[in-house]
Amino acid sequence: MRQSHQLPLVGLLLFSFIPSQLCEICEVSEENYIRLKPLLNTMIQSNYNRGTSAVNVVLSLKLVGIQIQTLMQKMIQQIKYNVKSRLSDVSSGELALIILALGVCRNAEENLIYDYHLIDKLENKFQAEIENMEAHNGTPLTNYYQLSLDVLALCLFNGNYSTAEVVNHFTPENKNYYFGSQFSVDTGAMAVLALTCVKKSLINGQIKADEGSLKNISIYTKSLVEKILSEKKENGLIGNTFSTGEAMQALFVSSDYYNENDWNCQQTLNTVLTEISQGAFSNPNAAAQVLPALMGKTFLDINKDSSCVSASGNFNISADEPITVTPPDSQSYISVNYSVRINETYFTNVTVLNGSVFLSVMEKAQKMNDTIFGFTMEERSWGPYITCIQGLCANNNDRTYWELLSGGEPLSQGAGSYVVRNGENLEVRWSKY
């Protein structure tokens, strides 16, 4: 177990709102670093031509101190291209991630944040999210996961934001924490990280707010932590395999809000390691999101003024180390049932290569019948996002989206990462959240 430091205390009045116990963090021991190698292999072997996954991977590797020079150089170039050429197109959360990745620690790339006024641009994008919420019944332009990233980045990099707006919009019962009736663990976890940063800034006097704001932030954090823990499974996963890493980060920084027996950190860690060994994290975004927690790190460890640490030697990674890729079964095909459901359901049978992802099935069906199965998508930091099918497009203001299902159950992975199985019944359904 690893000990972290309590926040500085300022005044007896604030004392009652500040965590009274030290944060306990479990992390992979050095002798078990070999069990993290599949995550690193996924990040090393992935194709970053579009540059969308690069930000998550750079953030993750820098945060835990792993330097793979040739890979990092390639991904930094992709990030620089996005900053210089298409910044107006990126969402607020993507821009927040770019800032976090560039400024994890003191490094040359950090200058891009200031040379291109990224903090100012994020402030504007965040304000646009707030204005959209005010105009559209509390619905942001993107989602609350990205909104939380915005607040976190602005907080860590001394940007301007309104504490009153944070208190107003981050109430735990806000509909944006939910998809239908299901609480979103990763959204709640990112909100806990953001609120914890804001609270620390209030305590340190970096931003001004009244006593009520600090109290409300503590109340919100406690409620969100309880909701996160309510999603804990018997095997220790929290929400699902892919939300567990960020849930761990949130619980690392909020130990004052739950009892020691409410969460067995080591059990969660061991289950995630088992999931890694079974190939669960084959998507670079998923691999990047889970790695920091396994190394005992959280996004609150980001500090643009601190020296970059290096843990590469402990992993025995060479910058040019060749990675052996296991090829899929040669010319092995599978058949799946695929349907699109709007008011009625449209079916087809699709044959794809063994090892194909959901997106490949959609692309094959589109070639078979573009009228019924034609779709459009956007490449985002979290992978491909299905925007329209049959010309019917997802709309944040209406809280509509295209839901991916297998056997009638919602998937926890996206179209670009979920690997389909022979005989599977796959569905894309027009839904509201």
UniProtKB/Swiss-Prot annotation:
Q: Which cysteines are joined by disulfide bonds?
A: C26-C265, C105-C308, C155-C197, C388-C393
Q: Which GO terms describe its molecular function?
A: cargo receptor ligand activity; cobalamin binding; molecular sequestering activity
Q: Which GO terms describe its cellular component?
A: extracellular region; extracellular space; specific granule lumen; tertiary granule lumen
In which tissues or organs does this protein occur?
A: Produced by the salivary glands of the oral cavity, in response to ingestion of food. Major constituent of secondary granules in neutrophils.
Which amino acids does the record list as binding cyanocob(III)alamin? 142-146, 186, 240, 289, 385-386, 402-404, 411, 433
Please name the InterPro entries in this protein's record.
Answer: Cbl-bd_prot (IPR002157), Cobalamin_Transport (IPR051588), Transcobalamin-like_C (IPR027954)
What is stated as this protein's family in its record?
Answer: Belongs to the eukaryotic cobalamin transport proteins family.
**Record's protein name:** Transcobalamin-1
Record the organism: Homo sapiens
* Classification of source organism: Eukaryota, Metazoa, Chordata, Craniata, Vertebrata
| Gene from which this protein is expressed | TCN1
